Structures are given as structure tokens and as C-alpha cells.
């Protein structure tokens, strides 16, 4: 039975996260994993090369050693295990899942805020604090987007939730109310 990528990412990230918690190394693991993820994102063919038969095993091992040269023993062993089990193509997904577990454990929420004009840092911070309070998060990491079509106000999207405080929505609701009455 073949496992899907989400299941693989979930299982491996869970095991690694549990180890990180046990060793009190969650932040360090995450930092190392993010660096490795970036290498694989920047070089999408790397996982295929490490998984395929184009390179001899000794060259693959040399490449793995180079990749993990500055990594902790735990991360080196983890990457070696992924290689041994033919899971190098799952590395990015595993790191994404690990980061999601980290964020969940720290009550960190990622959200996108859309505004009609570019927000100042102070405005973005105020929105992040208000949103954190609303969703019970310790921290909100905002990405910003400008869309003049919303006219004014903001729309905040996070985890399949949308909080729409845009003028465009208010006008639409007003229009509906006037038409229905």
C-alpha cells in the first residue's frame, strides 16, 4: 500500500517534532529544516537526483554529507533516514508539516491581510494584535496584499477563515438590504 504525500509528511514531521520537544530543540530543528527546505525549493531536481539512479550511491552520499555539513546530528540522521527510505521527494512537505506543528505549539497563526492601500507597519501590527486576540493566538504573522477593489477597510484570511471588514462588502450588504426591502 502506497502512502500519500500528506500522510508521509504528517507521520515523519510528528516523529521529528516529538524528538525536538523531547530534546528541547524545536527552534533549532526548525531553523535547520528551513535551510534545507530552501535548498530543495531552489533546486527542485535535487530530490529526484538523490532518489533516482543517475548518480552512484557514493556520490549521493557525498551530496547528502554536503547538504547536512552544518546540521545537528539529529537532522543529519533524519535526512539520512529519508534518503534510506526513499523519501527525499517528501522533504519539503515534511518540513512544512513540522513548521505547522511548531506554529500550532506556539499558537502562531499565519494570515493574509488585504487592504485598499498599503498598510503602515503600525497599522499592520495593530491588525495582527487584534486578530491574535480574536483567534486566541500568541502571535500572528501577516502577509500584506493591496487590492483597491475593496475600497476601504481590510480583509483578513487565515486557516480557511475570512474576516471581511471591507467597504466593498458593506456596500454589497447595504445594496442587498435595500433591494430586499
UniProtKB/Swiss-Prot annotation:
F-type ATPases have 2 components, F(1) - the catalytic core - and F(0) - the membrane proton channel. F(1) has five subunits: alpha(3), beta(3), gamma(1), delta(1), epsilon(1). F(0) has three main subunits: a(1), b(2) and c(10-14). The alpha and beta chains form an alternating ring which encloses part of the gamma chain. F(1) is attached to F(0) by a central stalk formed by the gamma and epsilon chains, while a peripheral stalk is formed by the delta and b chains. It is a peripheral membrane protein. GO terms for cellular component: plasma membrane; proton-transporting ATP synthase complex. It comes from the Bacteria. Keywords: ATP synthesis, Cell membrane, CF(1), Hydrogen ion transport, Ion transport, Membrane, Transport. This is ATP synthase subunit delta. It is found in: Cell membrane. Belongs to the ATPase delta chain family. InterPro entries: ATP_synth_OSCP/delta_N_sf (IPR026015), ATPase_OSCP/d_CS (IPR020781), ATPase_OSCP/dsu (IPR000711). It comes from Lactiplantibacillus plantarum (strain ATCC BAA-793 / NCIMB 8826 / WCFS1). The gene is atpH. F(1)F(0) ATP synthase produces ATP from ADP in the presence of a proton or sodium gradient. F-type ATPases consist of two structural domains, F(1) containing the extramembraneous catalytic core and F(0) containing the membrane proton channel, linked together by a central stalk and a peripheral stalk. During catalysis, ATP synthesis in the catalytic domain of F(1) is coupled via a rotary mechanism of the central stalk subunits to proton translocation. Pfam families: OSCP. The keyword Membrane applies. One of its GO terms (molecular function) is proton-transporting ATP synthase activity, rotational mechanism. The keyword Chaperone does not apply.
Amino acid at each position: 500500500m502506497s502512502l500519500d504525500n500528506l500522510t508521509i509528511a504528517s507521520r515523519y514531521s510528528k516523529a521529528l517534532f516529538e524528538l525536538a520537544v523531547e530534546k528541547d530543540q524545536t527552534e533549532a530543528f526548525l531553523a535547520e529544516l528551513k535551510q534545507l527546505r530552501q535548498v530543495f525549493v531552489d533546486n527542485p531536481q535535487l530530490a529526484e537526483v538523490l532518489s533516482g539512479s543517475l548518480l552512484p550511491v557514493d556520490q549521493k552520499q557525498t551530496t547528502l554529507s554536503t547538504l547536512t555539513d552544518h546540521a545537528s546530528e539529529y537532522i543529519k540522521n533524519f535526512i539520512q533516514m529519508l534518503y534510506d527510505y526513499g523519501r527525499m521527494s517528501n522533504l519539503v512537505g515534511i518540513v512544512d508539516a513540522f513548521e505547522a506543528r511548531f506554529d500550532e505549539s506556539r499558537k502562531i497563526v499565519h494570515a493574509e491581510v488585504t487592504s485598499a492601500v498599503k498598510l503602515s507597519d503600525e497599522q499592520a501590527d495593530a491588525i495582527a494584535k487584534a486578530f491574535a486576540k480574536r483567534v486566541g493566538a500568541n502571535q500572528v504573522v501577516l502577509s500584506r496584499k493591496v487590492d483597491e477593489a475593496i475600497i476601504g477597510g481590510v480583509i483578513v484570511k487565515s486557516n480557511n477563515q475570512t474576516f471581511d471588514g471591507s467597504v466593498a462588502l458593506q456596500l454589497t450588504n447595504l445594496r442587498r438590504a435595500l433591494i430586499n426591502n
